[in-house]
Every structure is written in C-alpha cells, then in structure tokens.
C-alpha cells in the first residue's frame, strides 16, 4: 500500500457570472494507516476535492497518485472507495446486498455474512433485509459507510459520513473509520464533527482553495 498523494491540484468552475477558482494548487498526502480529517467552511471545496481525488472529476492541473500510479480514470474499488454525500445505494437491493456488492464483484465468499456483521456493528443489523427506501437517511448513510469499508480498499474518501447520525449512532461510525485506518487504509474524511476530528491522526483545513494544517 502506498496511500494517497496529490500535488498541485487546481479546479475552476465556470459560471455565467465568471470563473470560480475552487482549488488553487492543493497538495496533500495520506499515508497507509492514517485517518486524516479535512475541515473548512461550507463551500470551501471539500466535496470538489474528494471528487477529484477519487477520479470522478478531472482537475485542471495537478496529479493524484494511488497504489503507486498516477490516476487517469476512477480506480477500482479495491484501490479506492468513495463515500459521497449522495450515497448511491441501489434501490432494488437490500441494505445487506448493497454492502456486499464490492465483495460479490470481487467474487469473495461469505459476502452477505460480512455485510450483516458490519451493519450490526453500525447498529442497523435488524434492517439488513430492508430496502433503502424503507429506512431513514441516517440508516442509509451507515449502510453506505459499511459498503465503503467492506472491501478493505487501500484508500477511503468519505464526505461528511456522520452528518445525519445522532449521538448514539455516530460513535460506531467513527470506530469503523478508525479501524479501517488501523488496518492499513489511508482514510481522508471531510467533516464538521468534533468526534471524527478527535479520532483522527491529524487535520487539514481547506480555505481559499488551499490546504493548511489544522
């Protein structure tokens, strides 16, 4: 595992009112085994940065490296898992089937059992057979987190993964993130929640299109 590296990331969005320079030469590195949080005010470009890092949006300049290679397209789920705010759960699959999807794509045995274990750890094991439309957004969010970590990717990028969780359910999500890092994953989490920041090894702050150390 080589973790995540980004160098000189630039991203400008063009609107009728003129260009908006969201990212201005962003450099960052997350080593295997690190949980790093990304802070910054709303609209500072955290989601835009995660999309570029995951390969789902193209930077205007700069490079992203994972698994020792420069990204030219979205990496496989074994290399990088992205947990966006738009969760992307498949409506025709149960929560357990959604969580197990990366394992089934990789033809890993015991996928539903592992998925159910993760859902239980996140406090929603009894909902494993429900469909996304039948549960709350916070419960969907926990299922999406389980799906992101189940395949043990080299890099995990998460955008506000505890934003819709209450004080009872958030600690389990934080433990799952911390455990992923402790197992060797490079974890970068955009968050406003103090509990996630406290569990992190360090915090980066995005402001004015640039990264500083929190």
Language-model segment annotations:
Residues 156-159:
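Catalytic Walker B motif of ABC-type/P-loop ATPase nucleotide-binding domains
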Residues 54:
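Helix-to-loop junction immediately C-terminal to a conserved catalytic motif
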């Amino acid at each position: 595992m080589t973790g995540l590296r980004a160098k000189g990331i630039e991203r400008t969005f063009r609107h009728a009112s003129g260009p908006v320079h969201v990212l201005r030469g962003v450099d960052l590195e997350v080593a295997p085994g690190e949980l790093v949080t990304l802070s910054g005010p709303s609209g500072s470009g955290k989601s835009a940065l995660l999309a570029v890092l995951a390969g789902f949006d193209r930077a205007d300049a700069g490079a992203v490296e994972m698994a020792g290679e420069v990204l030219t397209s979205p990496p496989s789920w074994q290399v990088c898992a992205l947990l966006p705010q738009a969760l992307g759960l498949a409506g025709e699959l149960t929560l357990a089937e959604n969580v197990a999807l990366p394992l089934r794509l990789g033809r890993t045995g015991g996928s539903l059992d592992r998925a159910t274990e993760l859902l239980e750890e996140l406090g929603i094991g009894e909902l494993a057979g429900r469909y996304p439309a039948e549960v709350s957004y916070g419960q969907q969010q926990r299922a999406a987190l389980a799906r992101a970590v189940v395949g043990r990717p080299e890099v995990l990028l998460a955008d506000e993964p505890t934003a819709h969780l209450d004080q009872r359910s958030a600690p389990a999500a934080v433990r799952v993130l911390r455990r992923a890092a402790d197992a060797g994953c490079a974890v970068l989490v955009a968050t406003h929640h103090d509990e996630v920041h406290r569990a992190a090894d360090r915090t980066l702050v995005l402001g004015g299109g640039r990264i500083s150390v929190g």
